[in-house]
Amino acid sequence: MPTPRMFLAAFLFSAVLLLADANAQTYSLLHAFSGLADGGGPEGQLIEDASGNLFGTTNWGGDGHCRNPGCGVVFGLDPSGVLTVLHTFTGKDGANPLGNMAYDGSDALYGTTADGGALMDCVNITKPVGCGVIFKLNKVTGQFTVLYRFAGGADGAGPNGLIRDAEGNLYGATGGGGMAGCGNSGTCGTILKLDTTGKHTVLYAFTGATDGGFPIAVVVDKAGNLYGTTNVGGDLNCNPNSGYGAGCGTVFELTAAGDFKVLHAFAGGKDGEELASYATLLLDPAGNLYGTTPYGGVQDCSGVPGCGLIFKINSAGKGTVLYSFSNGNLAYGENPYYGLTNDRAGNLYSTTTYGGNPFACYPGGCGTVDRLDRNGISTVVYTFENQADGKYPTFLTSDSAGNLYGATVGGGGYDASGTIFKIAP
């Protein structure tokens, strides 16, 4: 029997649809993954080349290595919607690609896998031996090269994405390895550099204390300074009993000279909480940093402390909450796990993993795409319905024409395993 709460949810959802329609942008499905040879669970941010081709990875699928359902693939999607698998991981060359790839602007893609690589220090009975790899793939010829295999000790384990500087050096983070001190997981992660000769260097090893632990992929400025976030550590009075270690995470700077500084330690509640985030920071030309936290904010979120927020840290290090996602209206989305992209007008776009239509993925919703304008007004751009459009959106990419490209890790029709989509202005 319908309850008053269900009628209220339906009314609020309809009201948001009216707001979204007033600012309508056009959604198109570009590809639905089968979970077989073409992969499944696309999670990293898509890369667009000058010809309009999109490139990305799937966390699983492929040809059946890594037991069922496969170790993942690297794919290309041309402007006509034809998907080509550029590389299928087998375990020894990496497994389960995670995080964003980097692109040299010509032919080379660089990425990471969370597992695989065949070194013996990281063993999981459901996956191949290995602590992850850094790889290079020529998107034209298909030539694949493992540039570095992680051993799982001081060098790190479980890399989660890359960024490339103007000289061709690669930078990234590992969620494990490094120093001990992060709850039940033991090690706290590292920041790394791989130079153009293939030399791997640990630039910083986290302790899990006030400096943070479990870092998320970094961004780099023109001066070579790195910025990123951690999932734990910082304010150790926040979430002190977490099995992953105390603290709600940090925003940090690692200068080109090697000096480490915490720019902000999340305090939980209205200030935000990074636990379990995949979000990479967005760096603007003025040196301001923008990001999301999946938890925290102004309201309780179905028993969890807050539905997440969008924040800014200016070049002087001052932090500001720009927007808090609210459980008061589920249709506006909840839990922005995957960070931000922007357009030329200065709008910020995010995805929420939950929220939207509460009846599509009952009771939490299948996620939304949202726009935050320069006046702080948030608008729902698209609501996922768990039909052909998929569910649980991840990272977004924007182009110079104002188009948004993104992926969902699930849905896309019966027995489908995620989608690639486009939202045109």
Predicted regions and their residues:
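Extracellular beta-propeller repeat domains
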Residues: 2-425
